[in-house]
C-alpha cells in the first residue's frame, strides 16, 4: 500500500504517514464505496483489518449486493474517519481521515480467508480469542472475505 497525498489541496491538514497507518489499524469501521451492478454509486459501512503490510481485509456474507457489485466493478474506495472535533464558533469541523483506493479481490484461498478472519478476531475481540476461533470455524462456510490491494 502506498502513502500518496498528491491530490490534497490543503497540505497543512495532512496526516503524517505514521498517524494514517495508526488510524487504518485502529479505526472501528470504514465506508466502502463502489459502483453497483447498475452503475450507480454504492457505499456501505464495514469492519476492516489492515494486514500491516499491503492490504485490507473485509468480511461479509457469501452473497449479496456488495459481492455482486465487486464481481462487476472491482475498483473501490475506503474512507476511514478517526477523531472528530466540532468547532461551532468557527463554523467548521476538524477531523482526521484516511481514504484508500484499490482493487477488491473476492476469490481468495481458504488459507487466506482463515488468516483474514483471525486478524479480524485479534482486532475486534481480543479478549475473546478462543471463543472467536470456535465461532470462525462454525461460520466459516457462510463468511466471505474481500481483500483490497
Predicted regions and their residues:
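A generic structural signal for nonpolar/aromatic side chains embedded in well-ordered alpha-helices
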Residues: 24, 69-70, 120, 148
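Solvent-exposed residues in well-ordered beta-strands and their adjoining turns
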Residues: 51, 61, 81, 105-107, ...
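Helix-adjacent hinge/juxtasegments
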Residues: 66-71, 77-89, 93
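Short, basic/aromatic recognition patches
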Residues: 3-31
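A generic structural signal for short beta-strands and their flanking turns/coil linkers
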Residues: 28, 44, 52-54, 72-76, ...
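Charged, gly/pro-rich active-site loop segments
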Residues: 2-12, 85-149
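Anion-coordinating catalytic cores for phosphoryl-, nucleotidyl-, and glycosidic chemistry
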Residues: 12-13, 21, 56, 65-68, ...
Amino acid at each position: 500500500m502506498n502513502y500518496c497525498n498528491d491530490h490534497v489541496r490543503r497540505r497543512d491538514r495532512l496526516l503524517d504517514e505514521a498517524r494514517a497507518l495508526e488510524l487504518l489499524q485502529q479505526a472501528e469501521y470504514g465506508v466502502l464505496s463502489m459502483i453497483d451492478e447498475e452503475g450507480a454509486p454504492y457505499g456501505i459501512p464495514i469492519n476492516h483489518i489492515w494486514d500491516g503490510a499491503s492490504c485490507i481485509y473485509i468480511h461479509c456474507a457469501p452473497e449479496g449486493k456488495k459481492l455482486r457489485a465487486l464481481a462487476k466493478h472491482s475498483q473501490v474506495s475506503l474512507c476511514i474517519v478517526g477523531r472528530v472535533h466540532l468547532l461551532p464558533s468557527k463554523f467548521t469541523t476538524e477531523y482526521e481521515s484516511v481514504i484508500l483506493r484499490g482493487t477488491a479481490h473476492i476469490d481468495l484461498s481458504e488459507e487466506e480467508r482463515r488468516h483474514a478472519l483471525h486478524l479480524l478476531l485479534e482486532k475486534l475481540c481480543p479478549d475473546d480469542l478462543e471463543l472467536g476461533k470456535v465461532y470462525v470455524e462454525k461460520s466459516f462456510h457462510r463468511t466471505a472475505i474481500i481483500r483490497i490491494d
